[in-house]
UniProtKB/Swiss-Prot annotation:
GO cellular component: chloroplast; small ribosomal subunit
Superkingdom of the organism of origin: Eukaryota
Record InterPro entries: Ribosomal_bS16, Ribosomal_bS16_CS, Ribosomal_bS16_dom_sf
PROSITE patterns recorded: RIBOSOMAL_S16 (PS00732)
GO biological process: translation
Pfam families to which the protein is assigned, alphabetical: Ribosomal_S16 (PF00886)
Keywords recorded for this protein, A-Z: Chloroplast, Plastid, Ribonucleoprotein, Ribosomal protein
Family to which this protein belongs: Belongs to the bacterial ribosomal protein bS16 family.
Matches recorded under NCBIfam families: S16 (TIGR00002)
Cellular compartments annotated: Plastid, Chloroplast
Gene: rps16
GO molecular function, one term: structural constituent of ribosome
Protein name: Small ribosomal subunit protein bS16c
Primary residence: plastid
Length: 91
């Protein structure tokens, strides 16, 4: 199973996180499948590669709680619903 979760980067006391698609059995710092975003909690900055996140969500990836909240703020799930309705109408 693939998960969308945070991977810690940065130095001591100055953590920044990458949002990555990674196998659920891998450790936090393990090899990721793809980097799909960035989150800096200190500066409160976020970058999300929305097409990549949508790709993994459509393939069945499960976001962790924090990644879910970050994606909700970036309105990724509204775009996912729009893509699903377009897909249903095309069939």
């Amino acid at each position: 199973m693939v998960k969308l979760r945070l991977k810690r980067c940065g130095r001591k006391q100055r953590a920044v996180y990458r949002i990555v698609a990674i196998d659920a059995r891998s450790r936090r710092e393990g090899r990721d499948l793809r980097k799909v975003g960035f989150y800096d909690p200190i500066k409160n900055q976020t970058y999300s590669n929305v097409p990549a996140i949508l790709y993994f969500l459509e393939k069945g990836a499960q976001p962790t709680g924090t990644v879910h909240d970050i994606s909700k703020k970036a309105e990724v799930f509204t775009e996912l619903r729009l893509n699903q309705t377009k897909f249903k109408f095309n069939q």
